[in-house]
Amino acid sequence: PPTRTVDLLLKYDLTPTVCTSDFALALGEMADYQGKVAKYHLAVDSGMNRIGVYHLDAVDFCRSIGFHRGLELEGTFTHFATADEDTDWNFRIQLERFNEALQQMRNARIDPGIVHAANSAAIERYPEAYFDMLRLGITMYGLAPAPNLAGLDDPAEYALARENAVACQVVDGAAHVAYL
C-alpha cells in the first residue's frame, strides 16, 4: 500500500501487506507515535513478479525492519501466479521458492507467523499449498478460477469494482505475471 495509507490502516486496525522498507518504516513510525504495534503480513515474491520481497531476500528484509518496536510480523504469504494453468512446472518452482524462504526465516529464528499461499486454483488443485490459511478468491463468487477448473455448481451474484493500481513494474518477457 502507499505510505499515505498508514493513518487509516492504524485507525481501523487493518493488517497490511508489507514488501518495501519505505512502507514498513512509515507504518512502524506512525504506529510507534500512536503507541500502537502494527501487525503486517510479509509478501514473498516466489515468481509472480508483481509484489513481494524476493524469496532469497526475506531474511535480510525481516532483519532490516525487525528492530522497529512499532511492527509485528503476523504472517507470511506468496501468490501462485500459475496455479490455474494446465501444467504445474511453474507452480512447483514457486512452491519450492516459498518453502525455501520459510525455511530460511525459521533457520534465522524469524517466526513467519500465519503462513498462507493457496488461492482459488491452488485450493482446488494443490493441497500441499494449504499451510495455515487459505485465500478463497474468485471461487467465493461461484466462478471457476480458470476454464479448466470446476468452480462451484451454483454461481452466486458478484460485483466488479474499479480500483487504483497498487504496483507497476517491468519484468522479463519470459516471466509469469498474475493478478493479486
Residue ranges and their predicted role:
Residues 15-17, 41, 116:
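Short, conserved beta-strand segments within well-ordered enzyme catalytic domains
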Residues 180:
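Terminal RNA-binding accessory module
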Residues 1-14, 18-27, 125:
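N-terminal active-site wall of soluble small-molecule enzyme domains
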Residues 3-6, 44, 77:
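Generic signal for short, ordered secondary-structure residues
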Residues 22-33, 37-39, 46-172, 177:
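Active-site loop/helix belt of alpha/beta enzymes
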